[in-house]
Amino acid sequence: MLKITVDLFSGRPNPTWIMDDKRGGDLLKKISRKKQIISRSDKGYNGLGFRGIKLELLGDEPSSNKLPSTFKIADGLAKDQKASIDLAREIVDQMTRYERTNMDVFRLTPIDRRIQKVILGSIEQYQRDLKRIQKYIRIKIRWPISPIRVTVNDSECPNCQYEESRFNPDFWNADPYVMANNNCYNYGRNWKTNTFAQPGRHSGATASSMSCPAVKTAAMNDGLVERCDCLPQSEYPRRLVALVIAPGIDYHWYRKQTGGFWGHKPGPTAARNYDNSGVLITDPQTCDRGAGTYLNYTDFCGFFYAGKSVIIS
C-alpha cells in the first residue's frame, strides 16, 4: 500500500490517504519511468503553503521500481518541475475517491471536495511562486547568540512581564520523528508532545472552524490569555505568542525569542525564524505569511501569553 500526504498545513493535520496495492503500484510504475520528478522527502520547500506531496511505501517488500521508500514530488527540488507538478495535480484530482476511508486524521482534515479545491489552488500558487520557492530552499537558518532565558517588561502592557528564550531550532529539527509530530502550536507553547497538538484538544473541544474567534477560544480553553492580561510570576515561564489564520483553512502560531525576533514551525517542517520571503521575523503582524487566495494566512488574530499552566495535547 502507498500512503499519500499533501504537505500543506501548519496547524491542522495534513490531508492524508492510503492507496491500495493496485492503484499505488500503478502510480509507482509511472513515477519509476521518470525519476527526475521526485526528490528526497526532507530537503525541499518548507515554508507556509503548499510544500509538495509525500509518498510513503507501507510495506517492507523491496520495490521492483527501485524507488526510495519515502520521497516527494512538487517540492521545489525535482529536476523536471513541470512533470512533477502535473503529477501532483493528477494525484489530487483523484483524492476524493478515498474520502470514505476510515483514518483518524479525517476528523480534523476530511478528504473532501472543499479540501481538494484548496490543494489544487495552492498548487497553482506554488507554480507561480516557483522562482521564489527555489531561492527560499537555499536559505540557511541563522540566529545570534543570546541569553538562554530573560524576563522582559512588555512594552505594550504596563506591569506585564513575560519570558523570552534563546532560539533553539535543533531541539525541533534534529530528530525527524520530533519534527514530523510537532507543529506550530507545540512550538508556540514550547512543549514537545509528539501529538501534533491542537488548540482545545486537551480541554475537550477543538476549534469549531478555522477562524480567529474559534481558534482563539480553543486555545484560551487550554489556558492561554490575551496579551495585557498579566500573568503572575507563578506562571513562569510565560511566553508571548501570536496567532494568524488562513480563513476557513488553517491556523499558525509564532513565539517571541530573545534577540528581537520571532520563531515558528510550519506543521511537520523545520523550526525557523524567517518568513516566506526569507526575511527575519521581527513582527508577525507584517511578515510574509503566504500569497494567493486559497492558503494565505491573512487574518492576524492577536497576541497571547502562554504560562506554565497551559496544557496542550
Where are these regions (language model features)?
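Function-determining sites in protein domains
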Residues: 1-148
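Solvent-exposed, acidic/flexible segments
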Residues: 17-20, 24, 177-181, 208-212, ...
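...with weaker cross-activation on analogous glycine-rich loops/strands in unrelated enzymes
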Residues: 208-269
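Active-site or metal-binding loop neighborhoods of secreted/extracellular toxin and effector enzymes
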Residues: 103-144, 260-313
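Substrate-binding/catalytic groove segments of enzymes
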Residues: 37-38, 63, 195-198, 249-264, ...
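Cysteine-nucleophile protease catalytic domains, especially the papain-like/related folds used
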Residues: 146-225
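Surface-exposed patches in mature extracellular/periplasmic domains of secreted proteins
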Residues: 38-46, 195-207, 226-236, 242
